[in-house]
């Protein structure tokens, strides 16, 4: 990748506008002054406690805990369940972050074993869970599923999974890295979506635009145990204030945008129908994100992206391979950039893609 190309583009297609460090830190300082924010000390303080509880209440959990990374959050949560049940078996879709993108930490650290659920290209169902006869301590469900373009189970399918886990006494954990993005599709509150999950992880930087960090949510006893285990892993950061302020000052504003971002995604799908050379996954929008499928090999897609950046000043993103050698996908998160781009400008970009010759 030519790292300087993106920086010289006037139009970035996916995601939200990124402030410079100076802009972001200035906004944080101003917000801290207006709200008289005081530092936490090793995670204890009025401001951080209030924010943790605010998010816990929003999702219907008893308590919340700031954790510096989602990688630490989720593996620890699942390991705690396995320890309690004295059974190291968990289940999840094979596209899950733990399974694919965490350097097999769960294996090398002997934390738990993973049974893959369902079809690689579809959200898994209660039927897929029942295909495993094993005794399972916990299952993880990612809502929505990023590697599938933001696909979600139907509301009935999700409720069937909740009921099946309750029936089999399986701890149901939510990977809610992009939970904020799915309420508009379900037309349900976050609390309704989270009901039936015993624990959840949410990101403070993806849809929220914060500097980083995450929250683990669950009952008070579970969160107290998790807090101890985060300390044992080196996660006991002295001041968490910067991360929490960065998220808290944007939290309500970003959640309020989600319906408009989903509506914009629906509009983009209609525009995409004008270009039959291009495909999109999922077939209908289920969150404010999508996989744009182009009829190009990865190498040709990269070449096209760089040419568009050089000639037009437009950055498409990072293409990925598919099962087909002459297909690639661009993941587009529909944030304020696509919300504000003119339809005709978007059509020009799509026409460039549709008529590309590499």
Identify the role of each PLM range.
Residues 1-42, 56-59, 331-340, 344, ...:
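N-terminal "arm"/small-domain region of PLP-dependent enzymes with the aminotransferase-like
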Residues 18-69, 83, 94-99, 105-107, ...:
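Conserved N-terminal alpha-helix of the aminotransferase class I/II PLP-enzyme fold
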Residues 82-141:
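PLP-dependent aminotransferase-like
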Residues 85, 277-358:
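Conserved C-terminal alpha-helix-loop-beta "cap" of PLP-dependent enzymes
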Residues 113-114, 172-174, 315-316:
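Hydrophobic beta-strand scaffold residues
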Residues 122-176:
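Active-site phosphate-binding strand-loop segment of PLP-dependent enzymes
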Residues 147, 152, 195-276, 281-287, ...:
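Active-site C-terminal subdomain of aminotransferase-like
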């Amino acid at each position: 990748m030519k790292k300087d190309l993106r920086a010289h583009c006037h139009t970035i297609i996916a995601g939200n506008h990124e402030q410079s460090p100076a802009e972001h830190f200035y906004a944080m300082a101003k917000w801290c002054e207006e709200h008289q924010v005081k530092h936490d000390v090793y995670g204890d303080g009025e401001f951080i406690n209030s924010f943790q509880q605010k998010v816990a209440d929003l999702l219907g959990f008893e308590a919340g805990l700031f954790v510096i990374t989602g990688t630490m959050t989720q593996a620890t949560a699942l390991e705690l369940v396995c320890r309690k049940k004295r059974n190291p078996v968990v289940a999840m879709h094979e596209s899950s972050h733990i399974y694919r993108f965490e350097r097999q930490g769960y294996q090398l650290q002997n934390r738990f074993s993973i049974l893959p659920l369902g079809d690689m290209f579809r959200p898994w169902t209660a039927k897929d869970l029942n295909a495993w006869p094993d005794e399972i301590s916990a299952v993880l469900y990612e809502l929505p599923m990023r590697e599938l373009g933001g696909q979600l189970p139907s509301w009935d399918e999700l409720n069937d999974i909740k009921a099946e886990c309750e029936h089999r006494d399986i701890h149901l954990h939510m990977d809610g890295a992009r939970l904020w993005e799915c309420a508009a599709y379900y037309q349900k509150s976050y609390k309704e979506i989270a009901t039936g999950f015993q624990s959840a992880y949410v990101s403070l930087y993806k849809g929220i635009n914060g500097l980083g960090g995450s929250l683990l949510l669950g009952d008070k006893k579970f969160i107290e145990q998790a807090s101890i285990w985060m300390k044992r892993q080196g996660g006991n950061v002295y001041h968490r204030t910067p991360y929490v302020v960065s998220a808290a000052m944007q939290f309500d504003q970003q959640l309020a945008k989600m319906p408009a971002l989903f509506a914009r995604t629906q509009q983009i799908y209609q525009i995409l129908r004008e270009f039959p050379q291009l495909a999109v996954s999922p077939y209908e929008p289920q969150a404010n994100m999508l996989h744009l499928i182009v009829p190009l090999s990865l190498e040709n897609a990269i070449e096209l992206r760089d040419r568009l950046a050089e000639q037009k000043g437009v950055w498409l993103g990072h293409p990925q391979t598919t099962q087909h050698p002459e297909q690639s996908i661009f993941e587009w998160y529909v944030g304020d950039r696509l919300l504000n781009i003119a339809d005709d400008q978007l059509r020009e970009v799509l026409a460039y893609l549709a008529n590309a010759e590499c």
